[in-house]
Amino acid sequence: MKYYAVIDTNVLVSAVLKWNSVPGNIIDLAFNDVIIPLVNQEILNEYKTVLLRPKFHLTELIVTDILDEMKARAIDVSEEHLDVELPDPKDRVFYEVTMKARESEDAHLITGNIKHFPTKPFIVTPRQMLDLILESSNE
Protein backbone atom coordinates (compact mmCIF):
# COMPACT_ATOMS: atom_id res chain seq x y z
CA MET A 1 0.00 0.00 0.00
CA LYS A 2 1.17 3.53 -0.75
CA TYR A 3 0.63 6.49 1.55
CA TYR A 4 0.58 10.08 0.32
CA ALA A 5 2.00 12.67 2.69
CA VAL A 6 3.34 16.16 2.98
CA ILE A 7 6.42 15.90 5.19
CA ASP A 8 7.07 18.94 7.36
CA THR A 9 10.62 20.28 7.36
CA ASN A 10 11.14 19.40 11.02
CA VAL A 11 10.59 15.71 10.22
CA LEU A 12 13.14 15.78 7.40
CA VAL A 13 15.70 17.62 9.54
CA SER A 14 15.21 15.21 12.45
CA ALA A 15 15.67 12.27 10.08
CA VAL A 16 18.86 13.67 8.60
CA LEU A 17 20.34 14.41 12.01
CA LYS A 18 19.38 11.02 13.46
CA TRP A 19 18.62 8.38 10.84
CA ASN A 20 17.84 5.65 13.41
CA SER A 21 14.73 7.41 14.67
CA VAL A 22 11.02 7.54 13.94
CA PRO A 23 11.48 10.53 11.57
CA GLY A 24 14.33 8.56 9.97
CA ASN A 25 11.93 5.66 9.44
CA ILE A 26 9.45 8.04 7.78
CA ILE A 27 12.05 9.32 5.32
CA ASP A 28 13.32 5.79 4.72
CA LEU A 29 9.75 4.77 3.81
CA ALA A 30 9.57 7.77 1.48
CA PHE A 31 12.85 6.80 -0.18
CA ASN A 32 11.50 3.25 -0.59
CA ASP A 33 8.19 4.27 -2.19
CA VAL A 34 5.91 3.36 0.71
CA ILE A 35 5.23 7.01 1.50
CA ILE A 36 4.82 9.20 -1.57
CA PRO A 37 6.01 12.71 -0.67
CA LEU A 38 3.78 15.57 -1.78
CA VAL A 39 5.72 18.75 -2.46
CA ASN A 40 5.80 21.98 -4.37
CA GLN A 41 8.68 24.32 -5.10
CA GLU A 42 8.09 26.37 -1.95
CA ILE A 43 8.35 23.25 0.22
CA LEU A 44 11.51 22.11 -1.57
CA ASN A 45 13.00 25.58 -1.09
CA GLU A 46 12.16 25.45 2.62
CA TYR A 47 13.82 22.03 2.94
CA LYS A 48 16.97 23.35 1.28
CA THR A 49 17.13 26.60 3.24
CA VAL A 50 16.73 24.86 6.58
CA LEU A 51 19.06 21.93 5.85
CA LEU A 52 21.79 24.36 4.78
CA ARG A 53 21.73 26.25 8.08
CA PRO A 54 25.27 26.27 9.48
CA LYS A 55 24.18 24.66 12.76
CA PHE A 56 23.41 21.40 10.93
CA HIS A 57 26.89 21.12 9.34
CA LEU A 58 25.53 19.64 6.09
CA THR A 59 27.33 20.27 2.84
CA GLU A 60 25.58 21.53 -0.26
CA LEU A 61 26.31 18.15 -1.90
CA ILE A 62 24.62 16.19 0.90
CA VAL A 63 21.58 18.48 0.85
CA THR A 64 21.36 18.25 -2.95
CA ASP A 65 21.50 14.44 -2.75
CA ILE A 66 18.72 14.37 -0.15
CA LEU A 67 16.52 16.73 -2.15
CA ASP A 68 17.18 14.89 -5.42
CA GLU A 69 16.11 11.64 -3.76
CA MET A 70 12.99 13.31 -2.41
CA LYS A 71 12.11 14.92 -5.75
CA ALA A 72 12.61 11.63 -7.62
CA ARG A 73 9.85 10.06 -5.53
CA ALA A 74 7.58 13.06 -4.96
CA ILE A 75 4.43 14.28 -6.60
CA ASP A 76 4.25 18.01 -7.26
CA VAL A 77 1.03 19.51 -5.89
CA SER A 78 -0.01 23.13 -6.31
CA GLU A 79 -1.19 24.64 -3.09
CA GLU A 80 -4.58 26.28 -2.90
CA HIS A 81 -4.82 29.41 -0.76
CA LEU A 82 -6.92 28.77 2.32
CA ASP A 83 -8.15 31.23 4.88
CA VAL A 84 -6.55 29.65 7.92
CA GLU A 85 -4.46 31.18 10.69
CA LEU A 86 -1.41 29.19 11.77
CA PRO A 87 1.11 30.14 14.47
CA ASP A 88 3.96 30.01 11.94
CA PRO A 89 3.11 31.53 8.53
CA LYS A 90 5.75 29.29 6.90
CA ASP A 91 3.62 26.27 7.84
CA ARG A 92 0.77 27.49 5.63
CA VAL A 93 2.14 25.94 2.42
CA PHE A 94 2.40 22.50 4.06
CA TYR A 95 -1.24 22.69 5.14
CA GLU A 96 -2.42 24.08 1.79
CA VAL A 97 -0.63 21.38 -0.23
CA THR A 98 -2.10 18.72 2.07
CA MET A 99 -5.61 20.08 1.63
CA LYS A 100 -5.22 20.30 -2.15
CA ALA A 101 -3.92 16.73 -2.31
CA ARG A 102 -6.84 15.52 -0.19
CA GLU A 103 -9.17 16.49 -3.02
CA SER A 104 -7.98 13.38 -4.87
CA GLU A 105 -5.95 11.26 -2.39
CA ASP A 106 -6.09 10.21 1.25
CA ALA A 107 -3.13 12.46 2.05
CA HIS A 108 -1.56 13.12 5.44
CA LEU A 109 0.57 15.91 6.84
CA ILE A 110 3.42 14.51 8.95
CA THR A 111 4.81 17.01 11.44
CA GLY A 112 6.67 17.12 14.70
CA ASN A 113 4.81 20.35 15.49
CA ILE A 114 1.27 19.02 15.51
CA LYS A 115 0.09 21.89 17.73
CA HIS A 116 0.91 24.35 14.93
CA PHE A 117 -1.90 22.95 12.77
CA PRO A 118 -5.66 22.50 13.09
CA THR A 119 -6.68 19.31 14.87
CA LYS A 120 -7.53 16.95 12.02
CA PRO A 121 -7.17 13.15 11.86
CA PHE A 122 -4.92 13.40 8.80
CA ILE A 123 -2.41 15.70 10.54
CA VAL A 124 -0.14 13.27 12.34
CA THR A 125 3.16 12.96 14.12
CA PRO A 126 5.86 10.73 12.64
CA ARG A 127 5.02 8.09 15.29
CA GLN A 128 1.30 8.19 14.40
CA MET A 129 2.10 7.79 10.69
CA LEU A 130 4.44 4.90 11.36
CA ASP A 131 1.77 3.23 13.54
CA LEU A 132 -0.82 3.71 10.79
CA ILE A 133 1.46 2.04 8.24
CA LEU A 134 2.35 -0.82 10.60
CA GLU A 135 -1.32 -1.41 11.49
CA SER A 136 -2.28 -1.50 7.81
CA SER A 137 0.47 -3.99 7.00
CA ASN A 138 -0.79 -6.32 9.75
CA GLU A 139 -4.32 -6.44 8.36
Predicted regions mapped to residue ranges:
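Metal-dependent nucleic-acid phosphoesterase active-site entry motif
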Residues: 1-20
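PIN/NYN-family metal-dependent endoribonuclease catalytic core
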Residues: 7, 22-52
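Alpha-helix capping/helix-boundary segments
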Residues: 11-12, 43, 94, 115-116, ...
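Residues at secondary-structure transition points
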Residues: 21, 38, 61, 85-92, ...
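Short, well-structured alpha-helical segments
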Residues: 60-71
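Active-site neighborhoods of divalent-metal-dependent phosphate/nucleic-acid chemistry enzymes
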Residues: 69-112
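Acidic, PIN/NYN-like endoribonuclease modules and their adjacent C-terminal/linker elements
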Residues: 103-139
